[in-house]
Amino acid sequence: MITKPIPYGRQHITDEDIQCVIDALKSDYLTQGPKIKEFEEAFASYVGCKYAIAVNNATAGLHLAATALDVNLGDKVIVTPLTFAASANCIRFRGGEVVFCDVEEDTYLMDIKKLSRLLSQSPKGTYKGIVLVDFAGYPANLEAFRQLADEYGLWIIEDACHAPGGYFIDSKGEKQLCGNGNFADISVFSFHPVKHIATGEGGMATTNSKKLYEKLCLYRTHGITKDPALLCENHGGWYYEMQELGYNYRITDFQAALGISQLKRADMGLARRQEIARRYREGLSDLKGVSLPFVSDQVFHAYHLFIIQVEDRLGLYDYLHKNNIYAQVHYVPLHLTPYYRQLGNKEGDQPGGIL
């Protein structure tokens, strides 16, 4: 029996991380200061996008994305059933209707063939957008989804919370990093402690659209702006306007300072995750009844999770926990949770999402 517990996930904090937080705490700004902009610019550079907006968590980032993309009461948005609740809840926050589209059985990503079939069954204009998830760190082929989305006039939110640093190879043989803004309208990342970059709580939205960037910034801070270029009136340097009903989704400077420090080691963390995944494959490959995750040679997997399938899931779960190995199950199929059942979803829907 393993005596030292192995947790499901944990953050990696160095002395440099701690010093960066201390320095921020000793500065003149605890929030709304220069570290936030520095973090945003560093992250935008890392993923290769034009604009990045730091927020207090990824759920807030997804909510802002749905708001900036004008999801309104009754708008239908297509979401994968195999994801954390926030991927769909961000649509419900806006009064939108979530329509689930099943996943591929090998990658656990939204099945583009099933999506195409779903879209073809209704007139164009029935759906407003798609929320794609880079599940477990496996990057979705956003180029293919973008082509289909454009055919039906849909926007794309990429839930990239599992996949900073991940990428797929496009039709031209070029790397397309998750969150680079080339195909998704807005991408969202998480900085929860079990993720690649940890700030306690925190998130980032990325985009290549100046218009969407300005909307995200506005809604992040109560719908208030002091930017002279955006004001309806201008009464001097003190003047500000509340132009929309926004939120307080700001991150703090000391969290941003931690994020900046963590980001410097992001590639090292990815390499470590790749190494661990290789060890898992070597150790588990000969075991009967264990299905290992599929990985195409056209993607770089960020390995937030290493997903296996077994015949007796609960039995294995209980055995591992009794031996201080705290593995987890991801996820309870979202369409079968009590909340989404009451909206008309039922057993037998989305069979690929029931692992």
Model-derived regions, located:
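PLP-dependent aminotransferase class I/II
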Residues: 37-41, 49-52, 113, 129-133, ...
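Phosphate-binding glycine-rich loop
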Residues: 29-76, 90-94, 100-102, 171
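Active-site phosphate-binding strand-loop segment of PLP-dependent enzymes
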Residues: 106-199, 204-212
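Short beta-strand->loop structural element characteristic of the AMP-binding/adenylate-forming
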Residues: 97-107, 328
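Conserved coil-to-alpha-helix start sites within the AMP-binding
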Residues: 83-88
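N-terminal "arm"/small-domain region of PLP-dependent enzymes with the aminotransferase-like
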Residues: 1-29, 34, 241-243
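Hydrophobic residues in well-ordered beta-strands that form the structural core
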Residues: 73, 79, 100, 156-158, ...
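Hydrophobic/aromatic ligand-binding patch that stacks against planar heteroaromatic rings
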Residues: 89-91, 148, 254
